[in-house]
Amino acid sequence: MKQKVSFRIVVWTAFAAFALFSLTAGVGAVQGDKKIRMYDDCDSATFNAVLGDGACIGNGHTTFDAFIGELSDTQDAHAWRNQPSAMEVNVGRPTFIENRGGEVHTFTPVAEFGGGFVNELNGISGNPVPAPECLNFGSIVFVPAGGTEVGPTAGSAQLPVGTHKFQCCIHPWMRTVIEVQAPPEQATTATAQDEHHSHH
C-alpha cells in the first residue's frame, strides 16, 4: 500500500507541474528538424490501478508488476526508452521531442545523468542520487502522451556547440546524448588556428 500511495502522489504531482509549466503540445515539425521520440509500453489497466486514472492512456502490453520486475532485475525497462539514445545535430537545426508512449515523460537537460524525482524508480534502476535538474520543478517540461514539444535549436544558448545530456526525470534510464556540431567554416577555422599555434 505504501508503494501504491507513494507512486500515486508522485504521478499527480507530475500532472500538476505539467499543467503549470508545459508548453503547448501538438507542435508541427519542420523540414530538416531532428526528432527525439520517447516510447513506453504501459498497460493502462494495471498502471492506472496503481498510479490513478489517466496515468497511462496507451495500449501497451507491459503490466505494472512486469515493469517493476524487469527494472528490479536489469535496472532497465527496455520498452521505456528515448530514440535515438545519441545523435549529432548541426548548428541551426531545430529539435522536437515526441512522446509516442502512454505515460507522461520529461526531456530534461542535465549536467550528468542521475536519478529523477521518483525515489522508488531511482532505487530499483540503480540511480539513487537524483540529478539536481530533476528536482527543479519550475524548469521541467512535461511531455504528455501523444504530445510534441519544441526542443532547443542547435547552436542556441540552450543548446550550444558541444555535448549535451538529456534524461526523463520520471524514468531516469531514458537518456539521450546530443552532440551539436559547428558549421564547417567554423570547424575549419578552429582547425587552422590549432595548426597555426602548434607551429609556434
Residue ranges, per PLM feature:
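Extracytoplasmic copper-binding redox domains, predominantly the cupredoxin/blue-copper superfamily
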Residues: 23-200
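Bacterial N-terminal signal peptides
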Residues: 12-22
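N-terminal secretory signal peptides that target proteins for export/translocation
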Residues: 1-7
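Short hydrophobic transmembrane-like helices used for membrane targeting/insertion
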Residues: 9-11, 27
